[in-house]
């Protein structure tokens, strides 16, 4: 069985107004695991921990369900939140693995110049100092898992450093 992973990537310098959303319909352990995984990454750069938002989780679940039902993988249009997406085909992922994949983009972020070499928008959203809440959810589409996290307030504002 072949497993592929995909994630939405941003062009360097693009404005990402997105966030993490979580679903209250999913297990409480998903919320705990996602929050812990995000906060481990944030602690590495001295940023305050996020709190879990059932409101954002519900919104994330709605969007994940929408993507799964329509066999799509794209950001929610006109969202007032920050948003990270993750997709795995032919396998499954844990919350820690999803966040670790996004966080691996840290290697492409240069704090000194505030520039990305490649993709780093998922990472910078996770560590965005102004973001206070996160909510995440997952939906299945046959062989695919689609993960959505919503963040409030959103990060990735052009010209500003994440922390």
Enumerate the language-model features and the residues they cover.
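Bacterial N-terminal signal peptides that target proteins for export
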Residues: 3-13
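Positively charged, low-complexity intrinsically disordered regions
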Residues: 6, 43, 161-162
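Hydrophobic h-region of N-terminal signal peptides that target proteins for export
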Residues: 15-23
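Short, well-ordered surface patches within globular domains
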Residues: 22-82
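Disulfide-stabilized extracellular recognition modules
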Residues: 78, 91-163
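Acyl-group handling in specialized metabolite and lipid biosynthesis
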Residues: 85
């Amino acid at each position: 069985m072949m497993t592929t992973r995909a994630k939405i990537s941003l062009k360097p310098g693009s404005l990402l107004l997105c966030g993490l959303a979580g679903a209250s319909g999913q297990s409480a352990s998903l919320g705990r695991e996602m929050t812990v995984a995000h906060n481990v990454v944030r602690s590495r750069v001295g940023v305050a921990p996020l709190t879990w938002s059932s409101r954002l989780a519900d919104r994330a679940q709605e969007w994940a369900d929408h993507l799964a039902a329509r066999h799509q993988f794209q950001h929610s249009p006109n969202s007032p939140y920050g948003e990270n997406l993750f997709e795995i085909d032919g396998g499954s992922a844990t919350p820690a693995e999803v966040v670790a994949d996004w966080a691996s983009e840290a290697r492409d972020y240069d704090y000194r110049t505030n520039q990305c070499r490649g993709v780093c928008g998922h990472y910078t959203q996770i560590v965005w100092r102004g973001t206070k809440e996160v909510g995440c959810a997952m939906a299945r589409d046959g062989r695919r898992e689609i993960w959505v996290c919503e963040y409030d307030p959103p990060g990735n504002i052009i010209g500003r450093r994440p922390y």
